[in-house]
From Swiss-Prot:
It comes from the Bacteria. The chain crosses the membrane at residues 16-36, 44-64, 83-103, 142-162, 180-200, 212-232, 301-321, 331-351, 358-378. It comes from Ectopseudomonas mendocina (strain ymp). This is Serine/threonine transporter SstT. The gene is sstT. Belongs to the dicarboxylate/amino acid:cation symporter (DAACS) (TC 2.A.23) family. Keywords: Amino-acid transport, Cell inner membrane, Cell membrane, Membrane, Symport, Transmembrane, Transmembrane helix, Transport. GO terms for molecular function: neutral L-amino acid:sodium symporter activity. InterPro entries: Na-dicarboxylate_symporter, Na:dicarbo_symporter_sf, Ser_Thr_transp_SstT. Its main location: membrane. Involved in the import of serine and threonine into the cell, with the concomitant import of sodium (symport system). NCBIfam families: PRK13628.1 (NF010151). It catalyses: L-serine(in) + Na(+)(in) = L-serine(out) + Na(+)(out); L-threonine(in) + Na(+)(in) = L-threonine(out) + Na(+)(out).
Amino acid sequence: MSQALHPALQLLNRTSLVMQIFIGLLAGIALALIAPQAALSVGFVGNVFVSALKAVAPVLVFILVMSSIANHQHGQQTHIRPILLMYLIGTFSAALVAVVASFAFPSSLVLSSQAAELTPPGGIGEVLKTLLLNIVDNPVNALLRGNFIGILAWAIGLGFAFRHASPGSKQLLGDLANGVTAIVKLVIRLAPLGIFGLVAATLAESGFDALLGYLHLLVVLVGCMLLVALVINPALVYWKLRRNPYPLVLTCLRESGITAFFTRSSAANIPVNLQLCQRLGLHEETYSISIPLGATINMAGAAITITVLTMAAVHTLGIAVDLPTALLLSVLASISACGASGVAGGSLLLIPLACSLFGIPNEVAMQVVAIGFIIGIVQDSAETALNSSTDALFTAAACMAEEQRQA
């Protein structure tokens, strides 16, 4: 059968998906430089890819979690608690890194009179209220809106209910999960084309000229994210596994982080992470819950963004910050980051919440948000890559640690 394939298809089958994505990336950059108008046109391909991922992710999570819980065998254990602990420690550590970096390399902003016309949450209570309302959302509405907290709540509830169903019903759920997984694999195979379109259109439309004025701020932001990805996260993985963490860290960055960087959506990257966990041979009943949960609450990148931009505003306005206040900012940024997925605009719109800690007026804070949108081409991409790859990394570390303990 394979001998009947066209030579181009044979080459495609022999080339790894990561290499295909890299080729798509280079092709997108080349097209944007040579023919910007054509590059704008192929942006449609990238939009289709992201839309396909976003479309399949809610259904995948709903079916997979429900099937995993319904088919759970008595005596089996999931390892969610240690993963949640790593999520919380990782997010708080990221906020601390951002505070230290902001003190060491203070950034200044050029604040204009224009502010983004967006409505930030009124306080941490409103963020928590939004999360609670998301939990009790209508299941159909949750699937339509991509509300993964609501999807998880209903999937877990129905999964426990189906534990008492007939073997045939449980088998049907398992078959549905396999069917959706097959569709996801097909969508992920389109990643090289999607990233080609996204990169070409983004560079043709924005370029990097708009970013040069905020180069120092971007270096601090991306530097913090790299430090967390390559130092803090490996330290947490070593704490769990007691062995060299870097092979696993680099695998997650390569397999999950690259795709997340270009899709700029943790939700869209859920299918990629689930497939990565499957390839790593992890415990399905654990990763089917921890990955979508991580896409909602594991927000190390968001904590860095909130902290660095808030500290930049504080430095620009000449506000003195003592150590206790900086620690309080870390806690506030960590809690706010966990609610970033429940706020339209994500981490950037939670900046006014952190700015309020220093008495910065909302008008000024929204100007900082506007700057965040200007640098979003890099900031949002790096943030999503860190967030999403960390979901897979911590899940893998916890599952492997449990396997070592039982061995």
